[in-house]
Amino acid sequence: MKTTKLLIPTQKEVPNDAQIISHQLMIRAGLISKLASGLYSYLPMGVRVLHKVENIIRQEMNKSGAQEVFMPVVQPAELWKTSGRWDKYGTELLRFTDRHQREFCLGPTHEEVITHLAAQYLRSYKQLPMNFYQIQTKFRDEIRPRFGVMRSREFIMKDAYSFHLDQYSLQQTYDVMYQTYCNIFDRLSLDYHAVLADSGSIGGDASHEFHVLAESGEDTICFSDESNYAANIEKVSFLKQEKTCKSTLTEERVLTKKKNSIEEVAEFLNVNKSDCVKILIIKTKDGFKALALRGDHELNEIKAHNLFGNFEFAIDDEIKNLDLKKGFIGIKDLDIDLIVDYSASVLCDFVCGANEWDYHLMSVNWQGIEFVDADLRSAVEGDYSPDGKGKLIIKRGIEVGHIFQLGTKYSSAMKVNVIGESGKAITTTMGCYGIGVTRIIAASIEQNYDDKGIIFPQAIAPFQVVIVPINYNKSTRVKALSDKLYQQFIGAGIEVLLDDRKERAGIMFADSELLGIPHRMVISDTHADNGNVEYKARDKIDKMQMKFDDALSFIQFKL
């Protein structure tokens, strides 16, 4: 392909609304164009990258034995009402009414549609297991679309759904899909971790997320420095610890006037935050609860939700009505249930509030205090790994894939039953497997860039090689050699871009680097005099000269 025949609207300026590097570079490199908030058009270079990502996914999914289907984006409300999600899904579900006053939605996911389809055509246990996938547009009416295609309203996903006779069969397919996802992300050259995860609004049992490591990631993931353990911070669990407190100190009431935060109290009393206990008051369906955590730990709200159901933090007036002093709440004289995090329950001679304005207690212990201990906190860097091997490292991650064991949540609601070997109807059990196709492009850029632009992995670069001829439109020798090399590459099946524009060399170099094309060949009159071409890899600083006749074999070796 020649540059003059392509739309590549590169730009120097960083868009004002582009906060993260992938958004900035995708706009600047002319991969995408913003239509409205959370809506983007893919331009020719972006489409080339998108298709390469899709092709890798499609190849690996086909290899796994999954069958490709293609389902409508527009979905009837009846299906969502049958599954129970029409009211539960919330405002992200874009609903509308057609001219006949029938309700529909734009699909953010396709569990309802695939189960409706399966209920029509899966009749016998002999047909199972079956795994269907599609690569399709989704729509979620995000309240705050941001970060370009990372969190847009319209996006492309690969979603797959498997149907099984029993849990054993589901586990087999789940394991196959886990490995398939690893194969996909390996081929995409992503630095990723598969982590234990929460099932979220889709629901279900076992669940893994696949996260690309990047500082711009919205999720926090934890992994061991010595083992394969990895989990979303929401899912890192801690075991109950043995209590070994043998205190010989006397409890002391101290004046801490106007010092009502852990940081202020610890500094004032010259103690570590880890030697303090803080109390949070929450409101649940069963009334108010007091949660005690170590001063340097934070409440994991997912764990709290799993323990208490929906809850809210108590507001100032509610705390006052409980006869508690905000900022000075302690573990004594509480008239509400006290739940203590495991790590706080083993503290000895600690600091906590005195339930009295401007006072704290020192050398406090748990003897005589009625409480229940539980796993309440979020992990912190340096915690021992839950598998007992090594310590936890905490990084930011971009979720690019998620696999679930759904069980019978949807197949039961949608009546996806088959006749078993005994002749009786059996409700199928399901798995669900998603990959954010468009998000992968942004995630890859977040890991592969420099101050000049994108450094695409070879597998998804828009072109494999760019030829940059100096004075292509002025020097007949340069034009002849460039055209010859261009034809050689095309003949060898190499995806090559020839920059035939009437531009300065600096502009052509800058654009090729911005676009992230892995290999660059430069031809000038000087090179022609010596029968050479100049080669530079996008991810390297050094350049090298080689004979023109060796250029094709050299690139073939690199590819």
Swiss-Prot record:
Q: Which GO terms describe its biological process?
A: prolyl-tRNA aminoacylation
Q: Where in the cell is it found?
A: Cytoplasm
GO MF term list: aminoacyl-tRNA deacylase activity; ATP binding; proline-tRNA ligase activity
List the CDD domains hit by this protein, alphabetically: ProRS-INS, ProRS_anticodon_short, ProRS_core_prok
| UniProtKB keywords | Aminoacyl-tRNA synthetase, ATP-binding, Cytoplasm, Ligase, Nucleotide-binding, Protein biosynthesis
Q: Which InterPro entries does the annotation name?
A: aa-tRNA-synt_IIb, aa-tRNA-synth_II, aa-tRNA-synth_II/BPL/LPL, Anticodon-bd, Anticodon-bd_dom_sf, Pro-tRNA-ligase_IIa, Pro-tRNA-synth_IIa_bac-type, Pro-tRNA-Synthase_IIa_type1
The entry's cellular-component GO terms read: cytosol
Please tell me where this protein is predominantly located: cytoplasm
Which superkingdom is the protein from?
Answer: Bacteria
- Which Pfam family is an annotated match for this chain, by its short name? tRNA_edit
Catalytic activity annotation:
tRNA(Pro) + L-proline + ATP = L-prolyl-tRNA(Pro) + AMP + diphosphate
| Comment on protein domains | Consists of three domains: the N-terminal catalytic domain, the editing domain and the C-terminal anticodon-binding domain.
Family indicated by similarity: Belongs to the class-II aminoacyl-tRNA synthetase family. ProS type 1 subfamily.
Q: What does this protein do?
A: Catalyzes the attachment of proline to tRNA(Pro) in a two-step reaction: proline is first activated by ATP to form Pro-AMP and then transferred to the acceptor end of tRNA(Pro). As ProRS can inadvertently accommodate and process non-cognate amino acids such as alanine and cysteine, to avoid such errors it has two additional distinct editing activities against alanine. One activity is designated as 'pretransfer' editing and involves the tRNA(Pro)-independent hydrolysis of activated Ala-AMP.
Assembly mode? Homodimer.
Give the protein name, as stated in the record: Proline--tRNA ligase
Gene name for this UniProt entry: proS
